[in-house]
């Protein structure tokens, strides 16, 4: 069972949490997340903190990059840690259903959730709260990257298509597809963030 490991590091490079992802898309447990409590338990060590401190530590340990980002600059929040690896000053959520409302109070936070029904619904909520979100629809309208990719993928031997994303659902997919097509559209992602409610159509 080969898995990729993404570490959540403190400024002193100590591991406070990590997530593993199965390299095979057919594994039932594709993502496994280890918060700081589980790390200590697996090593048979005691985490000497109060119950209140433990709650805070567990939350921080599953917010990937939270202790590394500079909140004086633009911070991009993603649904997953892997996406956050591809953009500087980013945070990745390790659990899809976690609330992020407390981050809406931070003026430098913007959101790039997944290009699917759930991700778009979450971003619509953020837009209503006046937060910057990524306009997937506008991005594809301008770049035609999704159409170019469909055409490129159809030219790939059917037996080899499983190696490639079926759709562009997140930043990880987007970067891979841009690489395959030798397209420089990823250099211009920042202009597709907006907090205007008039741009809801382009989500």
Place the predicted regions along the sequence by residue.
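TOPRIM fold recognition
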Residues: 16, 71-75, 81-203
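Phosphate-handling DNA/RNA-contact segment within nucleic-acid enzymes
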Residues: 1-107, 113, 122-123
